[in-house]
């Protein structure tokens, strides 16, 4: 973030993240790692260029060689965007092959792209033709395979690399959370009967951008009868006195780190007994599920020891009990006990993992629901709660 003082040496973070990727590449005997997802290119290099726009098109990518350079293929020719970055060894302009840019020449341009990647693999791969790719259209994959490259999936590499944060990364996540929570405060101060859901949500956006944040991934704020079931996006509905207002920040703050917390508030007046029951239930769930976490636990053990969801709330339970968070929501995804055998996978909690502990509590056919979520760090001895925004004592 230019014209501001970072809380840590950003080059230390950049080198750590690149080293994490190469460690995972080495485990899987991969010579090259081709990244197009803007979150992964950010993790590898910290070079940014129209992050959200670049999610639409294959217009920018990074090739990380295990025993060679990191080459950034950028949108157009803007080498000033990587000046001073220790993680970019070579800067090139990407040979794009999506129809908007290439028109009828898409196949020819895709072959040119494949030739360029193949040449770098030949020069720096030591005879290893294994390349892992996070996401690429069939035209791009065909261009790689036409050059006898063995294409594999990069996501096991990137997700496991991103899962363990350095102390410096955690410091940046705290900075992002501070901005997120300032935005929550601005929303809560603006909450009064008559404000629309969209106008309230705008307070979070405004604060995030003003304080150096980047964007918000979702529009998950709803009020009153729109809170249950969960996942309705914010609207022009005017919030009424006595409504519960629930939101999930999904905020990409300063330095690109995601702050993902959820809160539920009462709009003026006194809560009903049902509102207090819903809130207390959601609060009990996330408190229990945070307190059981410790390094060395398997994901299955977490699921088995998790808070048992009452039958009346099972149908509308959140899609995941716990998930990782870093530059975005990420590995791991730990399912609830009833879902684990059918949809879950196992793994181990490790120090340095940053996780979000989720709850949505709303009965099928009920008028309202409560969404709560906390962000935590797995330490050497247990868990530290990173998010500090207060809960609503009047609802407990």
Stretches found by the model and what they are:
Residues 1-396:
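Active-site neighborhoods and metal-handling regions in enzymes and metal-associated proteins
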């Amino acid at each position: 973030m230019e014209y501001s003082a970072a809380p840590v040496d950003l080059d230390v973070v950049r080198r750590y993240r690149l080293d994490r990727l190469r460690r995972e590449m080495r485990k899987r005997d991969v010579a090259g790692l081709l990244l197009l997802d803007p979150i992964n290119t950010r993790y590898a290099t910290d070079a940014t260029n129209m992050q959200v726009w670049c999610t639409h098109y294959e217009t920018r990518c990074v090739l990380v060689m295990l025993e060679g350079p990191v080459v950034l293929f950028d949108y157009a020719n803007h080498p000033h965007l990587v000046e001073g970055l220790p993680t970019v060894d070579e800067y090139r302009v990407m040979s794009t092959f999506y129809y908007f840019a290439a028109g009828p020449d898409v196949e020819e341009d895709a072959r040119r792209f494949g030739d360029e990647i193949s040449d770098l693999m030949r020069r720096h791969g030591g005879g290893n033709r294994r390349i892992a790719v996070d996401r690429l259209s069939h035209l791009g994959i065909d261009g790689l395979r036409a050059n006898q490259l063995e294409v594999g999936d990069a996501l096991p590499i990137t997700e496991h690399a991103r899962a363990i944060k350095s102390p410096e990364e955690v410091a940046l996540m705290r900075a992002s959370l501070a901005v997120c929570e300032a935005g929550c405060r601005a929303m809560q101060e603006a909450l009064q009967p008559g404000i629309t859901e969209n106008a309230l949500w705008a307070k979070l956006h405004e604060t995030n951008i003003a304080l150096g944040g980047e964007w918000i991934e979702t529009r998950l704020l709803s009020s009153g009868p729109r809170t249950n079931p969960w996942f309705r996006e914010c609207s022009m509905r005017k919030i009424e006195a006595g409504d519960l207002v629930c939101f999930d920040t999904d905020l990409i703050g300063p330095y690109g780190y995601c702050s993902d917390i959820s809160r539920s508030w009462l709009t003026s007046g006194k809560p009903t007994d049902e509102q207090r029951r819903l809130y207390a239930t959601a609060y009990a769930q996330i408190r229990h599920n945070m307190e059981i976490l410790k390094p060395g636990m398997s994901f299955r053990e977490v699921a088995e020891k998790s808070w048992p969801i009452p039958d009346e709330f099972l149908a509308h339970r959140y899609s995941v009990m716990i998930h990782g968070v870093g530059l975005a929501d990420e590995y791991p995804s730990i399912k609830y006990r009833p879902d684990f055998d059918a949809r879950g996978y196992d793994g181990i909690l490790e120090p340095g993992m940053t996780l979000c502990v989720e709850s949505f509590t709303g009965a099928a056919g009920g008028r309202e629901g409560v969404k709560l979520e906390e962000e935590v760090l797995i330490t050497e001895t247990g868990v530290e709660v990173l998010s500090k925004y207060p809960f609503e004592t009047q609802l407990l």
